[in-house]
A protein has these predicted regions:
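Glycine-rich, N-terminal phosphate-binding loop of Rossmann-like dinucleotide-binding domains
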Residues: 88, 238, 273, 305-308
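A glycine-rich (often HGG/GG-containing) alpha/beta subdomain
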Residues: 1-144, 148, 152, 163, ...
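Conserved beta-strand segments of alpha/beta enzyme cores
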Residues: 106, 267-269, 348
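C-terminal-of-GTPase-core extension/linker across diverse P-loop GTPases
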Residues: 2-10, 14, 55, 140-259, ...
Length: 449
């Protein structure tokens, strides 16, 4: 699977800047450098920066540059590599890259440098995900979590999982090797106890990966309610500026209005939806249709009611929409007026007044607490889709093994299932034999990384 050919890319991005960086890596990359780079000293020592000129085959100067050299295995990719710091003009960077490509390199694919780092055992897949998140982080909290994952500060759950599975595998091998003698001091109850612990750890890892998704991918929050209850006013108060048009005319919002809020490190995309009621025209019908779509896609729903008016049919429709939804916050707006609205007893509403600007911080606090329930920053991880699928498969497999123990199946058969369980957990860190799956892991990286 390892391609050690020379790859190159503009690592600083194809944008005009003061300095541009062209990254090159692969077997014989230092020999390539000697063909095009003319410093005062042509013997390259690692971890030093050399000043000189890049020249083409006709000895024409392409640029005056600084070059840093890295020798295998002590480089980002684990291979011989170098980086050219040139002037940051678009044409200069392209000329430098073309010069490298003409002398034996090929253009790197997105994420190929990091893929080589993984294949050369410089990083595991958890750290690869962390690198993506470092680049894409939108908040300081997301950046801190990504650094923790890169430095392997939050992989204790996975290590604990591996240890417990290895223990069961080793104990099962004793039963296979000595079928006539009961040399194991582990009884059925202890095996089942360990499997229960494995199941809980997998569930915990899935839960914390969901928290990681919030920090790195953000959360969709839909504000819903009948017309003229203050949805647009609430959007403006949450975001701190007048993003949505606010009038006394019901049905002003006919399309989804969105704005982003940084809520204690979590990027929140707030959607102000059209008021839900029996539509009066086609435009309003389309707006209400989009509101229902936003409700289905939202991670959290904020249902807004006018506390100064009695409950009506439109309010009841809203309550019916949210009754089977998991993450819902009920908000009573216009709390500065006399309250006339009566809600079912099992509802714990948040009273606010957009006019008086009260209760907004309480709403933000409730929203944040709903997102980070049972949250532990040191254990939050970011997993890609294939890793989450592997975890869910591991969860099902653990239950299958538990049944096999209870049914007293042959240890040789249980051994196969234990190995499969171990393989699923290994996929989280990096045991992937399918090249297509591996390519898919790194496709979301930018070129040059």
């Amino acid at each position: 699977m390892i391609d050690d050919g020379i790859i190159a890319a503009i690592a600083s991005g194809y944008v005009e800047s003061a300095i541009g960086i062209i990254r090159v890596s692969g077997k014989n990359s230092i020999e390539l450098l000697k063909k095009i780079f003319y410093p005062k000293k042509n013997t390259f020592e690692p971890y030093k920066i050399y000043h000189g000129f890049l020249k083409d085959s006709n000895q024409k100067i392409v640029d005056e540059v600084l070059v840093s050299v890295f020798k295998s295995p002590h480089s980002y990719t684990g291979e011989d590599s170098f980086e050219i710091n040139c002037h940051g003009g678009l044409l200069i960077m392209q000329n430098v890259l073309d010069l490298v490509l003409k002398n034996g390199a090929r253009l790197a694919l997105p994420g190929e440098f990091t893929k080589r780092a993984f294949l050369n055992d410089k990083i595991d897949l958890l750290q690869a995900n962390a690198i993506v998140n470092l680049i894409k982080a939108k908040t300081q909290k997301a950046l801190d979590i990504a650094f923790g994952q890169l430095l392997k500060k939050n992989t204790t759950i996975i290590e604990e999982l591996r240890e417990k599975i290895i223990f069961l595998m080793a104990e099962n091998e004793v039963l296979i090797d000595h079928p006539e003698e009961d040399l194991s001091d582990v009884d059925l109850n202890k095996r089942l106890l360990i499997l229960n612990e494995i199941t809980k750890l997998i569930q915990k890892l899935l839960k914390f990966s969901e928290k990681g998704k919030y920090f790195f991918e953000g959360v969709n929050v839909a504000i819903i309610g009948k017309p003229n209850v203050g949805k647009s006013s609430l959007l403006n108060e949450l975001t701190g500026h007048n993003r949505a048009i606010v009038t006394d005319i019901p049905g002003t919002t006919t399309d989804i209005v969105s704005e982003t809020l940084n809520l204690n490190g979590i990027p929140i995309k707030i959607l102000d939806t059209a008021g839900i009621r029996k539509h009066s025209n086609k435009i309003e019908y389309l707006g209400i249709k989009k509101s229902h779509e936003a409700i289905d896609e939202a991670d959290i729903i904020i249902a807004v009611f006018d506390s100064s008016r009695i409950l009506d049919k439109n309010d009841e429709d809203i309550l019916n929409i949210i009754k089977n939804k998991k993450n819902v916050l009920i908000v009573l707006n216009k709390s500065d007026l006399k309250r006339k609205l009566l809600l079912p007893l099992n509802i714990d509403p948040i009273e606010i007044s957009c006019t008086k600007k009260t209760g907004i911080n309480t709403l933000k606090s409730r929203l944040y607490n709903m997102l980070i329930e049972d949250y532990n920053e040191s254990e939050v991880v970011s997993l890609n889709t294939s890793q989450i699928i592997a975890l869910k498969s591991a969860l099902k497999h653990a239950k299958k093994i538990k049944k096999a123990y209870i049914d007293s199946l042959d240890p040789a058969l249980i051994s196969i299932d234990l190995q499969q369980l171990a393989d699923y957990i290994e996929q989280i860190i990096g045991k992937i034999e399918n090249e297509d799956i591996l390519d898919n892991v790194f496709k979301n990286f930018c070129v040059g990384k």
